[in-house]
Amino acid sequence: VTSRGFALALGVLLVLMGLAGFVPQLIRPAGGVHGLSLDAGRPLLFGWFGATALHNVVYAAIGVAGIVGSRSLTGAVSWCRRAGLAFFVLMLCGVVPHLDTMFGLMPLYGNDIWLNGLLWLLCAYFGWLHHNPPPPAPEAEREI
C-alpha cells in the first residue's frame, strides 16, 4: 500500500463514518446504569464511538482532505503527517479531564481514544516512515 492509496482509503472511510453519524438507525444511546454513567444521554455511532454533529463534521472534513491529498504523492504524504498530528492531539485530549469532551462539544473519550491512537500510528507510518520511491527510470538500451 502506498501513501496515496492509504490516504484515499482512510479518507473514504472517514467520510463514510462522518456521514454515518447523521443516520439515526446507526446511532445508539449510550449505555449506563440508570443514568449514572458519564456517557448517559450521549449518542454512540455503532454503539462504540461518540457521535455529535461536530464530531461527524470533523471526521468527514479530515476524510475529504485525505481524498483530495491522495491525488499526488506529495499531497498524500503531507496529509498523512497533518492528519497524524491531528489524531495524536485528539488522542491526548481524550485522556485529559475537561478536554475529553472538548468542553462539551465533541466526545473524545472511551473508544475514541484507541481509535485516534490507531489512526495516529497509521498516519505516522505512511507520512514519515513508509517511503514511496518514484518508479525506476527505464534503462537505456545497452550496446554490446
PLM features: residue spans?
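Membrane-interface extramembranous regions
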Residues: 1-144
